[in-house]
């Protein structure tokens, strides 16, 4: 309300929805922010459309084990796409269309991976959105995107348990750096030196 109070609470979804994380974006370009949910326990992932958050559309297989989600225009067509981190299956990009569907998709990563965190940023500053994933029990990856394919690169500890990833220019050189939140070990900043 402009005074630092959050008195109003609006439930949405269902009481048994096993949601792990939520991304916000105007998916249908109507001027209202929408909510993009990543669900676990084999439940469908959903987009809830603002401003009322009652209308929803599913995306994904309908039985994914998703752990994180981010949104960005991965193929440069002007439509927002959804990038999902999964465990026990490959991570996915669901491409948005002008019709509001997300039927076109691309899988990436190891099907045996346990990806718990995902973040999008233009790591090499070439105008394309790239992907960073944080994995449990194995090394992390980033994927450079040239719109036709994703080129995989490895970083991080061999047996690390990364549950969170964020990206930002921490040293002021205009190139995005990667920060990982790790369970049972040091949290680590990876400075972007090789992509300059």
Predicted regions and their residues:
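Short strand-connecting beta-turns/loops that link adjacent beta-strands
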Residues: 3, 29, 40-42, 52, ...
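Short coil/loop residues immediately preceding or within conserved phosphate-binding loops
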Residues: 19, 42, 66, 88, ...
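Structural signal for beta-propeller blades
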Residues: 43-46, 90-93, 139-141, 186-189
